[in-house]
Amino acid sequence: MFEVFVKKVNSDIVIRWLLTKITIPIADISAVTTDDTYSGKEKQAIRIGMPYGTTDRVVIITKKNTYILFTTNYIAIQKKLNSYIHSL
């Protein structure tokens, strides 16, 4: 229930968490990485998910914003995002 969900819709990535829905054009994504700090290195990032001690962080860097996804399933989300980016 508190997990972050990521899916591809046409040429966009849709991120859902609780009542939040964020749409990012795939063409705007420049990198997908991980972050091992507690709150994320990027101070101005948009944070999505529950930031508690055992979560990992997936970072999406776009032309305009940086998004930090707090998740316990970071490998699957990172693989999914990379496959969406390389499918264009």
Label each PLM-derived region with a short phrase:
Residues M1-P25:
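Conserved beta-hairpin
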Residues I13-R16, V32, L69:
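Short hydrophobic/aromatic-rich beta-strand segments that constitute the beta-sheet cores
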Residues L19, D28, N73:
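A short beta-strand motif that forms part of the nucleic acid-binding face
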Residues T20, S30, K64-Y67:
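A structural signal for the main folded, soluble domain(s) of proteins
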Residues T23-Y38:
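Phosphoinositide-dependent membrane-docking surfaces
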Residues P51-A76:
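Canonical phosphoinositide-binding patch of PH/PH-like domains
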Residues K79-L88:
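Glycine-rich, low-complexity intrinsically disordered segments
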